[in-house]
Amino acid sequence: MKIGVIMGGISTEREVSLNSGREVIKYLELLEHEIIPIIIDKKEDVMEKAKGIDFAFLALHGKFGEDGTVQSVLQTLDIPYSGCGPLTSAICMDKDMTKKILKYANINTADWVNVTNAEDIDYEAIEKIGYPVFVKPNSGGSSVATNLVKNKEGIKEAVELALKYDKEVMIENYTKGEEITCCMLNGKMLPVLAIRPHAEFFDYTAKYADGGSDEVVIELEENLHKKVEEMALACWKELKCEVYVRVDMIVKEGVPYVLELNTLPGMTKNSLFPKSANAVGISFAELLNSIVKYSLEVER
């Protein structure tokens, strides 16, 4: 099978995507597929460079990659691809929309408000949410332009920074607890990982620098494990996920809260999904093979 590994892109996460793509290529080649590296530098590249491939493995992150646009183009071209479809991808990229659906489905998530203008910040609403808060681009990823703000004085500057990366900014209550991530493969949860950043939170450096955080497989207390698994599965169903996603949560006083869903989780040597799969004996090559297999089974 001729597999095109699509990477790069035009988002702020381009370098992360290129790293994912290189790792994916290295291990897919072990499976004896014909691999075509496809580096995206501009939007039109998808139409031009994807011609002639049998399957697209998406190693993209961020806008024009994780937001359903590339998925829509590939569907138009009748090229099967890895991961979730356009609708789920678009919704999960929009943190505000994701949280609205979670709230509607009675799935725990931290309180938040969104703003589109640094001059129209509702400080009373933020006060009700309670400080400290995270201020971040609504559709951003990899914690780019994400700041922990501890009082009213720091809000405007953080909002202005986030607006440089997105037209909408989320201000979300900082729920202090243990950060965990649940990797879902074909609707089943792999072992839970605890994320223990060396910084105050799991920022860009903690995510991608060697030694930026400790990510360890943990065995949750039985009752909590059941709650977490049920919540991850509810997210999968409510947001109509397919093939694989990563559900990030915070556990506070025994109660899990969903932070966000990643429809194209990172695939670098530091990535969480391969670590979780490895804990049940699934090698990186086997994981990639499963993603290709399950993706081909999805009716688009």
Swiss-Prot record:
<keyword id="KW-0067">ATP-binding</keyword>
<dbReference type="Pfam" id="PF07478">
    <property type="entry name" value="Dala_Dala_lig_C"/>
</dbReference>
<keyword id="KW-0460">Magnesium</keyword>
<dbReference type="InterPro" id="IPR011761">
    <property type="entry name" value="ATP-grasp"/>
</dbReference>
<dbReference type="GO" id="GO:0008716">
    <property type="term" value="F:D-alanine-D-alanine ligase activity"/>
</dbReference>
<dbReference type="InterPro" id="IPR016185">
    <property type="entry name" value="PreATP-grasp_dom_sf"/>
</dbReference>
<dbReference type="GO" id="GO:0046872">
    <property type="term" value="F:metal ion binding"/>
</dbReference>
<dbReference type="GO" id="GO:0005524">
    <property type="term" value="F:ATP binding"/>
</dbReference>
<dbReference type="GO" id="GO:0009252">
    <property type="term" value="P:peptidoglycan biosynthetic process"/>
</dbReference>
<dbReference type="InterPro" id="IPR011127">
    <property type="entry name" value="Dala_Dala_lig_N"/>
</dbReference>
<keyword id="KW-0436">Ligase</keyword>
<keyword id="KW-0547">Nucleotide-binding</keyword>
<feature type="binding site">
    <location>
        <position position="262"/>
    </location>
    <ligand>
        <name>Mg(2+) 2</name>
    </ligand>
</feature>
<comment type="function">
    <text>Cell wall formation.</text>
</comment>
<dbReference type="GO" id="GO:0005737">
    <property type="term" value="C:cytoplasm"/>
</dbReference>
<feature type="binding site">
    <location>
        <position position="260"/>
    </location>
    <ligand>
        <name>Mg(2+) 1</name>
    </ligand>
</feature>
<keyword id="KW-0479">Metal-binding</keyword>
<keyword id="KW-0573">Peptidoglycan synthesis</keyword>
<feature type="binding site">
    <location>
        <position position="248"/>
    </location>
    <ligand>
        <name>Mg(2+) 1</name>
    </ligand>
</feature>
<dbReference type="GO" id="GO:0071555">
    <property type="term" value="P:cell wall organization"/>
</dbReference>
<keyword id="KW-0961">Cell wall biogenesis/degradation</keyword>
<feature type="domain" description="ATP-grasp">
    <location>
        <begin position="99"/>
        <end position="293"/>
    </location>
</feature>
<protein>
    <recommendedName>
        <fullName>D-alanine--D-alanine ligase</fullName>
        <ecNumber>6.3.2.4</ecNumber>
    </recommendedName>
</protein>
<keyword id="KW-0464">Manganese</keyword>
<keyword id="KW-0133">Cell shape</keyword>
<dbReference type="InterPro" id="IPR011095">
    <property type="entry name" value="Dala_Dala_lig_C"/>
</dbReference>
<dbReference type="InterPro" id="IPR005905">
    <property type="entry name" value="D_ala_D_ala"/>
</dbReference>
<dbReference type="InterPro" id="IPR000291">
    <property type="entry name" value="D-Ala_lig_Van_CS"/>
</dbReference>
<feature type="binding site">
    <location>
        <position position="260"/>
    </location>
    <ligand>
        <name>Mg(2+) 2</name>
    </ligand>
</feature>
<feature type="binding site">
    <location>
        <begin position="126"/>
        <end position="181"/>
    </location>
    <ligand>
        <name>ATP</name>
    </ligand>
</feature>
<dbReference type="GO" id="GO:0008360">
    <property type="term" value="P:regulation of cell shape"/>
</dbReference>
<comment type="pathway">
    <text>Cell wall biogenesis; peptidoglycan biosynthesis.</text>
</comment>
<comment type="similarity">
    <text>Belongs to the D-alanine--D-alanine ligase family.</text>
</comment>
<dbReference type="InterPro" id="IPR013815">
    <property type="entry name" value="ATP_grasp_subdomain_1"/>
</dbReference>
<keyword id="KW-0963">Cytoplasm</keyword>
<dbReference type="Pfam" id="PF01820">
    <property type="entry name" value="Dala_Dala_lig_N"/>
</dbReference>
